């Protein structure tokens, strides 16, 4: 049974620093630009609407104040998690159009809620040209959530972003796979020390995009499912310069298409988000058109007649359970997924200039300097926990659990296959 795609716009730019003192980042225009090139019609997707972000206004924020726009990002993340949860409750496959990488906080919150509801962990496949792993423990400055999103969703950083609703971390380090960072990423050793699995561009290219997607899936075999984050700056600036921090040494559109198709061609993939495309640097719309072509082809397995949706059904409204303490979830002993057997290397002609060290969104001349983060709070921080949709429960598996009682069947398309 095919899975219906639902496209939700999340046009926030709150996680980026202003390109100049008198302008705002343009990535908030990305959903409109992609829609203008026929994305929804070509995907035959349901229009899930737009979650309008708060105004981009740094106000009197100064270096040393922590992450800029933190209260606004926190509240927006709760609302975005509600919307993503509602899509999943309908048995649909969410495609979230950012916006900057701070949208990952809302997606991560939705996945943590889901994992809690089904009694399992949800993983993250993080496809990005940068590790976005800057945090107070490894840097003298922070300030832009879009350059710190992976750190925040793994529980590092100020509590009003890293522990929304008292949930921390949203993803465990062992449940994260990072693909597409540059070979000299500034925080690659920190990722390794944290136990976060990575495959930089040279290794991704050597193994091939299809095998890399399968390998990523195997790394998360112990999870109930996974979310896919795609920052288009994973692409080489020779083919995709319309981003806030272009960095040489990226992949090609064809590789991204194959990678995306492999990641979503399983009921374990719960949804995808696309971030950081900036139409202000796409004067003729050609890059938007190329992104649409790639996304449509890459998501083809989702809407294939043979696609199998996850095995989850939405219950009635469920209020979040109280979460006492400082928001740090109790650790559970979990064995890591077995590593995949490496496949023979496949030679691929590299594109663009030679690799250079990753500057983590900060040395681009269009950007301002950052600031030091504030200390973590001891108690849960952020907005009031949502009571909206997105709470899902397990349904019986044939030859495993007892059959469902009459009347428990959910909407069409919600019979799934998440282990």
Predicted regions and their residues:
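Conserved alpha-helical scaffold segments that buttress catalytic/binding sites
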Residues: 3-419
